[in-house]
């Protein structure tokens, strides 16, 4: 069902007029009543159900142990009953697309259990087909819309010794030496336009292919598939001093122990989560990745586009998982198609638009209520991922395919942006600085014009279009037009208390500790704010972040790790990691980390895991400011360590070791050739290094010049003190490796 309707076009100008008249709450109220979607806010991501395995006589047990292996993507549960050790090994096979549960015991003939499938869905049927149990159904209704995803799960087993049988939806195993339970799940979903797939045949084929193989062969295929991604990167922050301590207690004790092996594990866990939740050909990681046990999860576990889904993919390129970016890129392709209807019907504009949320059906209209949903710049933020993919890979064919998407997003803003009456700046209106109320409405409304995030996003998007058009030798007239339009936009502003303004007006409250820090997009993930190029804005961003505070929702703290790293303050970034690694055992506490290392908003949101994973790399290496900065935000806690396999823009793979806080060894592997500019806090020695001069000739490191910021006369700015560094150029050849030692 569409989430746009024709009368929205009639009311958006009325909302805009109220904003320009300073009647922000009236504008927001009108938008909620007349502009926001009435019948469809997107469909939820839903759980299939549960596997239950009961073991008669296992109520009294000892030596209980469980683990998740980040080396092999398997879980192990082990315990003893009456002197017998039982083990349950579970994996969800990348290679075979089935769940496998292997049951073993230390004595023969001891595996006896009953297994069944249950689901919270209502429209379901459980059946037995020979040696298979099936659970079939259809996704649930939501907000008056009928679920249309038909699904089937199939379960069977293979045993060594003993007997097995299926009856009344229960799989029974008795007296086996070993058993493997197999579960396949399939749906009729092919893509957002096609649900004609045959879920029954798909589930049958997955299951029958899997059971035809030896378990150990299947396990090896799964582990090999996983390791091709996981083993690309390693992080060493020291020995494991607490190997015998359970994960929840390690998190609970982190503030006292400074358990940096846990930090390295948390980093690895972030990569594990992306590998498992974002495989090419599938859907992108949503608010909970793929790990949702409810029919109606918080925020429907969809794709929130005003920070969250973007944060999910911050680690993709930099931690050497570029292929796993593809599901998000495919989503961007698809919302650029569905977003045409929203642009035309809601705004009367060409191009495409995405507001703050989408789902598997790629809705793009303004959903929920105006305080969050009236934000039309989601497409601009997503387009940054197309650009970043190009910067990391240098893939011109990819850029050529992405350019029409970027161009049409840019065309939409070219048509809908208007001149505001106070400064005559070109702005987006109506919009909001995501989910944050402002003083112009006495804290009662978010709706505004010319918000800093919008300006930064469109500045980036239009510059990316201009650069790409010239690289491809196309659309010269449109590129020239956008260059002129950029000059008419609102610049960044530094407000009365030295802060980077979040809004066009100086409304920022120094006591505001809102979870979103949207106006700092230009610092991270953007690159408009730099200690070298824009020191005043750099200081203002720091002032804003100090006043925003540290403790917050889990995902907000993950973002702040990245921001403090960009502010070159490793100790403060480490403090945010410490805050994020605060144990949360229930839904009532503030943000932190659950006992299994899932990020706590609360509830669980996966973006915090991914944000912190990216932030740890930002502490060790940055490549956004025209050069590769080695150890830019190394905390005092990490005196010695190494990271291998991380990726800098331009396609440079780095192995980096340090001792006493200084680079000791660096290996640069050049994938595409070109100039590699390095900045280091200590001198480097090695063949090919020369002192850097002028602009970096590598086009993947070019940075557009921003508009001159406006600084309030009352603002008291601090001088940005930069550490002495050494800047080198290295001309590289594709496929070559270069080794340097620190002095």
Which residue ranges define each predicted feature?
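C-terminal catalytic domain of Rieske-type non-heme iron oxygenases
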Residues: 289, 293, 426-428, 435-436, ...
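Acidic, turn-prone loop/beta-hairpin segments
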Residues: 599, 606, 620, 625-648
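Extended, hydrophobic alpha-helical segments in both membrane/secreted and soluble proteins
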Residues: 308, 375-389, 398-415, 556, ...
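Well-ordered alpha-helical segments within folded domains of soluble proteins
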Residues: 307-317, 376-387, 453-463, 518-527, ...
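Long alpha-helical scaffolds in large eukaryotic adaptor/regulatory proteins
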Residues: 393, 469-472, 571, 623, ...
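Beta-strand segments within the central parallel beta-sheet cores of soluble alpha/beta enzyme folds
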Residues: 114-116, 327-330, 345-346, 398-408, ...
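Acidic/histidine-rich catalytic neighborhood
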Residues: 408-468
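Aromatic-residue-lined binding/catalytic grooves and analogous aromatic/hydrophobic interfacial grooves
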Residues: 2-371, 388-390, 407-410, 421, ...
């Amino acid at each position: 069902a569409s989430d746009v309707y024709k009368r929205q076009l009639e009311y958006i100008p009325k909302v805009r007029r109220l904003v320009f008249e300073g009647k922000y709450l009236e504008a927001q109220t009108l938008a909620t009543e007349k502009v926001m979607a009435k019948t469809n806010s997107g469909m939820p991501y839903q759980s299939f159900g549960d596997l239950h395995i009961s073991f008669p006589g296992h109520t009294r047990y000892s030596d209980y142990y469980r683990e998740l292996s980040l080396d092999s993507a398997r879980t192990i549960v082990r315990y003893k009953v009456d002197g017998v050790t039982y083990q349950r090994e579970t994996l969800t096979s990348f290679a075979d697309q089935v769940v496998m549960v292997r049951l073993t015991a230390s004595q023969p003939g001891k595996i006896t259990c009953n297994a069944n499938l249950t689901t919270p869905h209502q429209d379901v049927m459980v059946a037995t087909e020979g040696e298979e149990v099936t659970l079939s159904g259809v996704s649930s209704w939501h907000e008056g819309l009928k679920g249309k995803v038909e699904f089937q799960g199939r379960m069977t087993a293979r045993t060594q010794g003993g007997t097995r049988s299926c009856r009344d939806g229960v799989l029974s195993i008795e007296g086996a030496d070993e058993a493997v339970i197999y579960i396949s799940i399939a749906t009729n979903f092919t893509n957002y336009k096609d649900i004609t797939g045959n879920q029954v045949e798909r589930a049958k084929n997955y299951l029958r292919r899997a059971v035809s193989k030896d378990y150990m062969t299947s396990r090896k295929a799964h582990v090999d598939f996983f390791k091709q991604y996981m083993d690309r990167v390693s992080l060493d922050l020291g020995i494991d001093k607490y190997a015998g301590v359970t994960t929840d207690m390690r998190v609970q004790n982190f503030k006292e122990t400074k358990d940096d092996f846990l930090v390295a594990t948390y980093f690895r866990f972030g990569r594990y989560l992306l590998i498992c939740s974002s495989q090419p050909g599938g859907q992108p990681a949503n608010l909970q990745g793929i790990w949702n046990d409810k029919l109606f999860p918080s925020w429907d576990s969809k794709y929130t586009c005003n920070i969250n889904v973007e944060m999910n993919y911050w680690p993709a390129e930099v931690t050497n998982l570029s292929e796993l970016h593809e599901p998000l890129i495919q989503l961007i392709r698809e919302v650029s198609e569905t977003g045409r209807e929203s642009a035309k019907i809601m705004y009367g504009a060409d191009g495409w638009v995405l507001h703050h949320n989408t789902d598997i059906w790629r809705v793009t209209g303004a959903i929920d209520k105006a305080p969050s949903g009236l934000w039309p710049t989601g497409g601009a933020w997503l387009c940054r991922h197309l650009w970043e993919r190009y910067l990391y890979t240098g893939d011109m064919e990819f850029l050529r395919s992405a350019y029409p998407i970027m161009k049409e997003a840019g065309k939409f803003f070219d048509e809908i942006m208007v001149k505001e009456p106070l400064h005559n700046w070109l702005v987006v209106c109506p919009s909001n600085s995501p989910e944050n109320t402002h003083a112009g409405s006495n804290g009662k409304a978010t709706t505004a014009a010319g918000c800093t995030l919008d300006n930064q996003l469109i500045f980036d998007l239009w510059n990316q279009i201009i650069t790409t058009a010239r690289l491809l030798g196309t659309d010269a007239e449109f590129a020239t037009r956008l260059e002129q339009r950029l000059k008419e936009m609102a610049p960044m502003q530094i407000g009365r208390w030295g802060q980077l303004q979040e809004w066009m007006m100086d409304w920022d409250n120094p006591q505001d500790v809102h979870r979103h820090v949207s106006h700092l997009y230009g610092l991270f993930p953007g690159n408009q704010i730099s200690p070298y190029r824009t020191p005043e804005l750099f200081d203002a961003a720091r002032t804003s972040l100090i006043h925003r505070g540290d403790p917050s929702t889990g995902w907000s703290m993950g973002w702040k790790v990245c921001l403090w790293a960009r502010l070159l303050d490793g100790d403060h970034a480490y403090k945010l990691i410490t805050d994020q690694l605060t144990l949360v055992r229930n839904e009532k506490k503030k943000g932190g980390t659950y006992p299994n290392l899932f990020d706590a908003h609360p509830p669980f949101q996966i973006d915090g895991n991914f944000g912190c994973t990216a932030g740890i790399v930002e502490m060790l290496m940055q490549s956004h400011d025209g050069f590769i900065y080695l150890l830019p935000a190394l905390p005092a806690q990490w005196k010695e360590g190494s990271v291998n396999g991380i990726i800098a823009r331009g396609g440079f793979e780095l192995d980096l070791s340090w001792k006493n806080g200084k680079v000791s060894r660096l290996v640069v592997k050049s994938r595409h050739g070109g100039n590699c500019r390095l900045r280091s806090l200590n001198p480097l020695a090695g063949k090919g290094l020369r002192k850097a001069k002028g602009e970096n000739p590598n086009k993947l490191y070019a940075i557009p010049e921003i508009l001159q910021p406006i600084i309030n006369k009352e603002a008291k700015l601090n001088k940005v003190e930069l550490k002495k560094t050494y800047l080198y150029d290295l001309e590289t050849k594709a496929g070559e490796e270069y080794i340097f030692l620190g002095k």
